[in-house]
Amino acid sequence: MVNELLVKQAIEDRRYLHQHPELSGEEYETCKFIRSRLEALNIEILDFQPPSLVGFVKGTKGDKTIALRADIDALPIMEEGDKPFSSKNPGVAHMCGHDGHTAILLAVSEWIAKNTKDIEPNIVLIFQSAEEISPSGADKLVQQGVLKNVDAIFGIHLWQGMDKGKIGLKPGPMMASVDDFEITIQGYGGHGSMPHETVDPIYVATHVIQSLQSIISRKVNPMDPSVISVGKIESGTTYNIIPDSAKIIGTIRTLSPDAVRTIQSQMVQLTEGICKAFGATAKVDFIIGTPPLVNDPKESEFVESIIRRTFGNDVFELVEPVMGSEDFSYYLKEKPGAFIYVGMNGKKSMYPHHHPKFEIDEEVFPDAIQLFIEIIKNYR
């Protein structure tokens, strides 16, 4: 299995990265760190726009090319806890495991550099900026042509929602799309004592908010899991003034592109209809985000066979889809591939992703590294 020195280096790298987190789109020092490591391994650096970084290793056959990806950005969260390698950047922390993903792919890069004579396919190593925001780093890299000559792409996520010792994925839709919305309701304000002389946008907004859920229950195919959530309402300035306008801000999650289209069209129709009934007007804006993550069936089967053969049948887990999103989906829209969860839920990883006390379990690093190595060794 994986060399202990390789794992030790991965842990050291992860802890260094954890101490020096950078926000999405600002990972320039992280990029410099990765570049220095790859250059020390004599791995070619391809010409892609920083702060993402892409390495390339030519295989002995070179008739196939696979890409491996790690995201490198941190979150705007104040870390809680007293570990000796806590974030040194106040208000910024690796609370999703991207420090681990980066360290794991660096370890795999080192293995590749030391075993080039035994590696048949070409390898593209993607260290990707800005997974946590939109427009995302994956979308930008795809537009820049990072997958131009790639046959398949693979990525992992250290996953707190899966038990430690399990590794798994799901063929087909595995993670949801995310599209945000802003609904602006224009009414007619006035004094709070005379509501009959106004068109109260707050009152109208309450009807819109409650009615949005009817789209999920009555307009979307029940076989297409979907969510509409309102996260913010903005309106008014004080207690005795009915305002002119109200804004409703929220998010749409679904595993189906068809459901996205249905939800958006129905939101516009429903909102405009309700507003018209009350004498108000509405403007509905959508902020298009990450598409659903859909694993390729063939590559999923390939990964499942590797997990079962390498780690044992009891390690593989066929996962349930989740309504969280992941911009790895942009790669999978372009090329076949698979996104894989490496479970780590347990005593060392009890808090969920994006929690101020989130922690990854470094004991799962050997399996994650080995998984990538086996994908490289067995891809044909």
PLM region spans:
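Acidic/His- and Gly-rich active-site-bordering loop/insert found
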Residues: 1-94, 99, 103-119
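General structural feature for long, well-ordered alpha-helical segments within catalytic domains
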Residues: 2, 6-13, 26-37, 64, ...
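Divalent metal-coordination and catalytic microenvironments
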Residues: 17, 55, 68, 98, ...
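Active-site beta-loop-alpha junctions enriched in small/polar residues
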Residues: 22, 71-73, 130-132, 159, ...
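Conserved hydrophobic/aromatic beta-strand scaffold that supports enzyme active sites
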Residues: 54-56, 182, 339
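Histidine/acidic-residue-rich, glycine-tolerant segments that coordinate divalent metal ions
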Residues: 75-77, 83-93, 100, 117-243, ...
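Metal-dependent amide/peptide-bond hydrolase catalytic core
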Residues: 206-380
